[in-house]
């Protein structure tokens, strides 16, 4: 019985990381979409907005990397 529960816990951890990765991908999509929308409104700010977009994408992807790190740490 204990081995079955261990297998279920391992599967739940994998599902949890998968959901975290999906959340990160949605976040990146929102950041990039809003940047494109902002550049369409004010093209003169394109360079500054692009830099801010990369910072936002980096922070969003860092959450996914933290998620995979905790998955391997607590596995």
From Swiss-Prot:
InterPro entries: ATP_synth_csu_bac/chlpt (IPR005953), ATP_synth_F0_csu (IPR000454), ATP_synth_F0_csu_DDCD_BS (IPR020537), ATP_synth_F0_csu_sf (IPR038662), ATPase_proteolipid_c-like_dom (IPR002379), F/V-ATP_Csub_sf (IPR035921). SUPFAM superfamilies: F1F0 ATP synthase subunit C (SSF81333). GO terms for molecular function: lipid binding; proton-transporting ATP synthase activity, rotational mechanism. The chain crosses the membrane at residues 12-32, 49-69. The record marks 61 as: Reversibly protonated during proton transport. It is a multi-pass membrane protein. It comes from the Bacteria. The keyword Membrane applies. The keyword Repressor does not apply. Belongs to the ATPase C chain family. HAMAP family: ATP_synth_c_bact. This is ATP synthase subunit c. The gene is atpE.
């Amino acid at each position: 019985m204990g081995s079955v529960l261990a297998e279920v816990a391992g599967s739940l951890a994998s599902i949890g990381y998968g959901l975290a990765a999906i959340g990160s991908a949605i976040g990146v999509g929102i950041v990039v979409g809003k940047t494109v929308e902002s550049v369409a409104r004010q093209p003169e700010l394109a360079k500054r907005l692009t830099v801010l977009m990369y910072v936002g994408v980096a922070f969003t992807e860092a959450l996914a990397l933290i998620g995979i790190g905790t998955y391997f740490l607590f596995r």
